[in-house]
């Protein structure tokens, strides 16, 4: 990762140093301030660009993989696959991705464009199904190596080394609460640990779907917030760091994501809507008056054009005709 001064040596040096911006219109009625960490401004438009690079680089440094020889394998709901795909392309690796068939068509197209071998799995089996298929492929692939985002320490490590320090610097150390949707748990674990080391009073808030509230003691279930709520507690997630888990429904998340586009000019994915909805709930609590909350917006909305997020907009666009 570089400071973006001059010309980068390759695309991986463009990762990180994403901006922070206050939410204004959608945060009316809040007694605290809410800022968003715009991870959709990464080279391939999601926070997973960070871990795609970090997991491959870490394995290289340990001598576990070599370009042109090793075959990388990973189960993903989409964005980690894209983060791995552009790094693998830049470094010269073959990559096999397993992904639930319920993920957006945009993700399939992007992965294929990067030269990925894509294997779709039963959507009813969720991420567990994708993981099982990846393990099956690994067992029969010579020189195969699974990066294991849900277990790989290089996942939270990159957030400890980059995301956390960026937020601390960007807020001039004035952050009071950090909000992150929980998929692998890498972002909240890594960035959260760094922020708490700087100031133990910083509160960490995890966001999960109401429909699959595992962290809150509920059962896994189907939901529409792609990228979070995997249906199990990942090994890299340090739950002891989290001060509170905020539940947000799929409908709340979708409505907020649409509102962010119309009222803030921020075209974001559904999980960003979930993070914003959770942050606004927190910033409306009387005890949080004057406090600053930072929410991670993980991905760009253009990756979700075929999903429920843009159903009405897509139908309107498709029904339009030219004027004489």
UniProtKB/Swiss-Prot annotation:
Its cofactor is pyridoxal 5'-phosphate. Pathway: Amino-acid biosynthesis; L-cysteine biosynthesis; L-cysteine from L-serine: step 2/2. GO terms for cellular component: cytoplasm. The modification N6-(pyridoxal phosphate)lysine is found at residue 48. The keyword Transferase applies. Pyridoxal 5'-phosphate binds at residues 79, 183-187, 271. GO terms for biological process: cysteine biosynthetic process from serine. It is found in: Cytoplasm. Its EC number is 2.5.1.47. The keyword Protease does not apply. Homodimer. Belongs to the cysteine synthase/cystathionine beta-synthase family. This is Cysteine synthase. It comes from Brassica juncea (Indian mustard). The lineage of its organism: Eukaryota, Viridiplantae, Streptophyta, Embryophyta, Tracheophyta.
């Amino acid at each position: 990762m570089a400071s973006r001064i001059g010309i980068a040596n390759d695309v991986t040096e463009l990762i990180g140093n994403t901006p922070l911006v206050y939410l204004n219109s959608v945060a009316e009625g809040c007694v605290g301030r809410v800022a968003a960490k715009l991870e959709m401004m990464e080279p391939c438009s999601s926070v997973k660009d960070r871990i795609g690079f970090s997991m491959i680089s870490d394995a290289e440094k340990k001598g576990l993989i070599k370009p042109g020889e090793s075959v990388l394998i990973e189960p993903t709901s989409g964005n980690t696959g894209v983060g791995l795909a552009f790094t693998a392309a830049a470094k010269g690796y073959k990559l096999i991705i397993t992904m639930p068939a319920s993920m957006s068509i945009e993700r399939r197209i992007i992965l294929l464009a990067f030269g990925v071998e894509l294997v779709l799995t039963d959507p009813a089996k969720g991420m567990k199904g994708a993981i099982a298929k990846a393990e099956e492929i690994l067992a029969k692939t010579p020189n195969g190596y699974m990066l294991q985002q849900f277990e790989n320490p290089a996942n939270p490590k990159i957030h400890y080394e980059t995301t956390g320090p960026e937020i601390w610097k960007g807020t001039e150390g004035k952050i009071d609460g950090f909000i992150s949707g929980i998929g692998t748990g890498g972002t909240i674990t890594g960035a959260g640990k760094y922020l708490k080391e700087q100031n133990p009073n910083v509160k960490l808030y995890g966001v999960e779907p109401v429909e699959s509230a595992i962290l809150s003691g509920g059962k896994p279930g189907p939901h529409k917030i792609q990228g979070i709520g995997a249906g199990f507690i990942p090994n890299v997630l340090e739950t002891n760091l989290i001060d509170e888990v905020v539940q947000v429904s799929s409908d709340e998340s979708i409505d907020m994501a649409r509102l962010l586009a119309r009222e803030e000019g921020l075209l974001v994915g559904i999980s960003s809507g979930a993070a914003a909805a959770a942050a606004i709930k927190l910033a409306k609590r009387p005890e949080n008056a004057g406090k600053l909350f930072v929410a991670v917006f993980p991905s760009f909305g253009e990756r979700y054009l075929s999903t429920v997020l843009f159903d009405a907009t897509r139908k309107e666009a498709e029904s339009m005709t030219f004027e004489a």
